[in-house]
Amino acid sequence: MSGDLSPIDKAKFVAAKRAAELVEDGMRVGLGTGSTAAWLVRCLGEMVREDGLKITGVPTSARTAELAREVGIELITLDEARWLDLTIDGADEFDSELNLIKGGGGALLQEKIVATASDQMVVIADKAKEVETLGAFPLPIEVIPFGWQTSQALVEETLISMDVMGRSSTLRMNGASPYVTDEGNHILDLHLNRIGNPRQLALVLNQIPGVVENGLFIDICDTVVIGYGDGKVEVRDINEGTIETDRIDFVETDNLFADLND
């Protein structure tokens, strides 16, 4: 079955597998959203079923909640948990300071709330997500539906004074209709190409009326686990300043990989 998975999927899996090893009995764990985070949820589910791992998960989207229930992870709400030991999530881009762009999966608001309510945030990603400067991936911002075009115009006007290379934005669509987040909002994708000052941009965007949250995660991520298609894994801890390398044996099992299609 290993021939059925692309090198990128293998990289995502080994990163998720390595990150799952950070989870211990009794932990309250934030469960991210997206294709890489889905591997993590599957890995944790296998540990719950086969190793007796006892954890409670807080999902960052309805999709993640559904998958977590399918694989046997006990779920609670963030209000019930109050605070989390660890959140593990993917990223669309990350730089050397572990600043992130997230929100490609449409769950940036809940993802940021859960991540900031955790003692530690670990990002899992393949090597292709590492960039020298953020911005090649469109930056998502969540806006309320009321007056979204006005919010869009204000955002584009604000970008004129920001250190970015592009200033256009598009409303994310789901077929012929606007994409709707779990919170009932829309998403504008900002095509910036390069973000010279992510910290400043994150602060300024959230001051614009109608903007609920943006996909820049600044000073939130503590560790990144980078997977490679050959099974190599690199763990970078921004707080400790350490870099560890490891190798994960890639053994596919039907119960772990079946129906993982996102």
Swiss-Prot record:
Source species of the chain: Ruegeria sp. (strain TM1040)
Active site (UniProt): E111
Family of the protein in this entry: Belongs to the ribose 5-phosphate isomerase family.
Record function comment: Catalyzes the reversible conversion of ribose-5-phosphate to ribulose 5-phosphate.
GO biological process assignments: D-ribose metabolic process; pentose-phosphate shunt, non-oxidative branch
Subunit (UniProt): Homodimer.
Assigned EC number: 5.3.1.6
This protein's name: Ribose-5-phosphate isomerase A
Keywords carried by this UniProt record: Isomerase
Binding, substrate: T33, G34, S35, T36, D89, G90, A91, D92, K102, G103, G104, G105, K129
HAMAP family assigned: Rib_5P_isom_A
Presence of the UniProt keyword Glycoprotein in the record: no
Family matches, as InterPro entries: NagB/RpiA_transferase-like (IPR037171), Ribose5P_isomerase_typA_subgr (IPR020672), Ribose5P_isomerase_type_A (IPR004788)
Record pathway: Carbohydrate degradation; pentose phosphate pathway; D-ribose 5-phosphate from D-ribulose 5-phosphate (non-oxidative stage): step 1/1
Catalytic reactions of this protein: aldehydo-D-ribose 5-phosphate = D-ribulose 5-phosphate
Gene this chain is encoded by: rpiA
Keyword Isomerase: yes
EC class of the enzyme, as a word: isomerase
GO cellular component terms, semicolon-separated: cytosol
GO MF: ribose-5-phosphate isomerase activity
